[in-house]
């Protein structure tokens, strides 16, 4: 990069973190940077509303990705990064194309494979139809006990409780009687991630809705009407709905742990590499949530902008995502659900 040329910033991924970083860089650095996003998809999907979709409360919103990227003052390349050469400052796409960069931001998000064999995975293909079919079976008296569970791995746990509450609400509204709903998780208390006060409130709401809570449960598999759990034993279940396991997509040359996550410092620098950052669900931050991804992206963008000659200096930054979730303004349930 010369004094006359903008810094080439390549962003791998165009989810919340990737788009937020592009927007922040436009605001903070302007023409000092040339931002290119690389992503395989053509749409940006706003996932939070997907929890309500099977119950008729809303639909997952979709936006043309090219328009969002253009509005952020960046360019979009269709593809997926498969390899990183940090010494050469190049990434290689799955089709063999190489792209040079001055600074790289890895914001590729995560994959969502099945966590509990035999269970209905929320976040998998056909989830809306599958949950709709489960509700129909419960209303018909074919399902008497539904267990909602999650793996003991980093994720955003709130959707599990939303699914349980909305299932209870729908079955009550449609006068389906005799269906027991259970939330079985590795947590010691409901949504303990949010702190004691929020956890106590969720426990109260579960009790009001006659939803059983089973703590310290590590789901293994569902078969023959039983959810087998660690460290041993099983729970009776006519149906099981599980959140997926989250795994980072492998990129050769990028330091990743066994789950595919990337370790960074407080500014988002990937440990062990120069001029490579990471933000969003691909990082090893234990909570995976869009608001946290956006804050991480803002932190990274501020550091990149400062390096390019614009914005605030990195010394002024604080890793806002490093604090406990209980200290953040994240409501455990939307007001209309409480």
Predicted feature locations:
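C-terminal, flexible cofactor-proximal segment of oxidoreductases
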Residues: 301-338
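Conserved beta-strand scaffold positions in the cores of enzyme catalytic domains, especially
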Residues: 37, 76, 119-121, 213, ...
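Beta1-alpha1 glycine-rich phosphate/pyrophosphate-binding loop at the start
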Residues: 2-74, 152-193
């Amino acid at each position: 990069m010369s004094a006359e040329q903008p810094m080439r910033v390549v962003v791998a991924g165009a989810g919340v973190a990737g788009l937020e970083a592009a927007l922040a860089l436009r605001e903070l650095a302007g023409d000092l940077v040339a931002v290119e996003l690389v992503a395989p998809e053509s749409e940006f999907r706003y996932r939070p509303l997907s929890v309500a979709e099977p119950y008729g409360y809303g639909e997952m919103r979709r936006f043309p990705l090219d328009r969002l990227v253009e509005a952020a003052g960046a360019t979009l390349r269709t593809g997926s990064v498969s390899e990183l050469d940090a010494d050469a400052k190049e990434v290689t796409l799955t089709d063999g194309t190489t792209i040079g960069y001055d600074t790289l931001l890895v914001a590729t998000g995560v994959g969502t494979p099945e966590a509990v064999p035999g269970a209905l995975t929320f976040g998998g293909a056909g989830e809306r139809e599958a949950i709709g079919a489960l509700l129909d079976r419960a209303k018909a008296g074919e399902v008497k006990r539904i267990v909602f569970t999650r793996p003991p791995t980093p994720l955003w746990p709130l959707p599990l409780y939303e699914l349980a509450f909305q299932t209870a609400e729908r079955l009550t509204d449609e006068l389906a009687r005799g269906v027991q709903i259970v939330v079985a998780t590795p947590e010691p208390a409901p949504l303990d991630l949010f702190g004691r006060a929020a956890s106590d409130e969720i426990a109260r709401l579960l009790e009001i809705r006659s939803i059983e809570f089973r703590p310290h449960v590590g789901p293994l598999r569902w078969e023959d009407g039983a959810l087998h759990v660690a460290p041993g034993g099983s729970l009776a279940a006519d149906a099981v709905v599980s959140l997926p396991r989250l795994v980072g997509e492998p990129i050769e040359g990028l330091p990743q742990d066994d789950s595919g996550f990337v370790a960074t410092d407080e500014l988002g620098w990937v440990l062990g590499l120069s001029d490579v950052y990471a933000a969003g669900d691909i990082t090893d931050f234990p909570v995976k949530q869009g608001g946290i991804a956006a804050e991480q992206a803002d932190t990274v963008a501020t550091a990149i902008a400062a390096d390019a000659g614009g914005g605030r200096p990195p010394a002024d930054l604080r890793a806002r995502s490093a604090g406990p979730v209980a200290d953040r303004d994240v409501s455990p349930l939307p007001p209309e659900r409480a």
